[in-house]
Amino acid sequence: MARKVVVVDDEKPIADILEFNLKKEGYDVYCAYDGNDAVDLIYEEEPDIVLLDIMLPGRDGMEVCREVRKKFEMPIIMLTAKDSEIDKVLGLELGADDYVTKPFSTRELIARVKANLRRHYSQPAQEVSGTTNEITIKDIVIYPDAYSIKKRGEDIELTHREFELFHYLSKHMGQVMTREHLLQTVWGYDYFGDVRTVDVTIRRLREKIEDDPSHPEYIVTRRGVGYFLQQHD
């Protein structure tokens, strides 16, 4: 069965070009041209991936991303004419998986679509989640086979990537991992983003698992090097 792609862009010529080229690659493609229609379309079609422009009439891309993330975990690639670091970081914090700055190469964008689909829907690598045994860290329990974690018996909702990152750190307890290493290992060698993606995902994780994210007890920063998961007796 063909993968479903939703393209959201208020510039119809761009949406048409993307639709044409994605269909040539064998994808089923659905288009929306404003934020409100985009949310309705995504909820109706439940696509495998979304290409989402930031500048949209109605709701902007950031609002659409936030709304979609309330229910869905499919990869979201942000399309933006802004080459601003704050836009990229904000998009990632809201749950986007990747971003492309306009003007972009259609070939490059399709490569990113394929890479994001492959990473998100393929079986996790053995190194990241090969065990089915529960892992307990203080009051957190990781269930690798169920792709879930609990803290003090309560479920903590993590995205696919957040879980993989936390699980990988748990398998290397106390070892400092550089951002570059985490990007290559958890996101994959074909990921097009930069190490800021790791920082954003760590920040989201801390907000979900730490009692006080500003004074983390689990995921600790080694300044100038990277991150590690603190051991607890």
Swiss-Prot record:
<comment type="function">
    <text>Member of the two-component regulatory system WalK/WalR.</text>
</comment>
<dbReference type="InterPro" id="IPR039420">
    <property type="entry name" value="WalR-like"/>
</dbReference>
<dbReference type="InterPro" id="IPR011006">
    <property type="entry name" value="CheY-like_superfamily"/>
</dbReference>
<dbReference type="GO" id="GO:0006355">
    <property type="term" value="P:regulation of DNA-templated transcription"/>
</dbReference>
<dbReference type="Pfam" id="PF00072">
    <property type="entry name" value="Response_reg"/>
</dbReference>
<keyword id="KW-0963">Cytoplasm</keyword>
<dbReference type="GO" id="GO:0005829">
    <property type="term" value="C:cytosol"/>
</dbReference>
<feature type="domain" description="Response regulatory">
    <location>
        <begin position="4"/>
        <end position="117"/>
    </location>
</feature>
<keyword id="KW-0238">DNA-binding</keyword>
<dbReference type="Pfam" id="PF00486">
    <property type="entry name" value="Trans_reg_C"/>
</dbReference>
<keyword id="KW-0902">Two-component regulatory system</keyword>
<dbReference type="GO" id="GO:0032993">
    <property type="term" value="C:protein-DNA complex"/>
</dbReference>
<dbReference type="GO" id="GO:0000156">
    <property type="term" value="F:phosphorelay response regulator activity"/>
</dbReference>
<dbReference type="InterPro" id="IPR016032">
    <property type="entry name" value="Sig_transdc_resp-reg_C-effctor"/>
</dbReference>
<keyword id="KW-0805">Transcription regulation</keyword>
<dbReference type="InterPro" id="IPR036388">
    <property type="entry name" value="WH-like_DNA-bd_sf"/>
</dbReference>
<dbReference type="InterPro" id="IPR001867">
    <property type="entry name" value="OmpR/PhoB-type_DNA-bd"/>
</dbReference>
<keyword id="KW-0597">Phosphoprotein</keyword>
<keyword id="KW-0010">Activator</keyword>
<feature type="modified residue" description="4-aspartylphosphate">
    <location>
        <position position="53"/>
    </location>
</feature>
<dbReference type="InterPro" id="IPR001789">
    <property type="entry name" value="Sig_transdc_resp-reg_receiver"/>
</dbReference>
<protein>
    <recommendedName>
        <fullName>Transcriptional regulatory protein WalR</fullName>
    </recommendedName>
</protein>
<keyword id="KW-0804">Transcription</keyword>
<dbReference type="InterPro" id="IPR047791">
    <property type="entry name" value="Resp_reg_WalR"/>
</dbReference>
<dbReference type="GO" id="GO:0000976">
    <property type="term" value="F:transcription cis-regulatory region binding"/>
</dbReference>
<feature type="DNA-binding region" description="OmpR/PhoB-type">
    <location>
        <begin position="132"/>
        <end position="231"/>
    </location>
</feature>
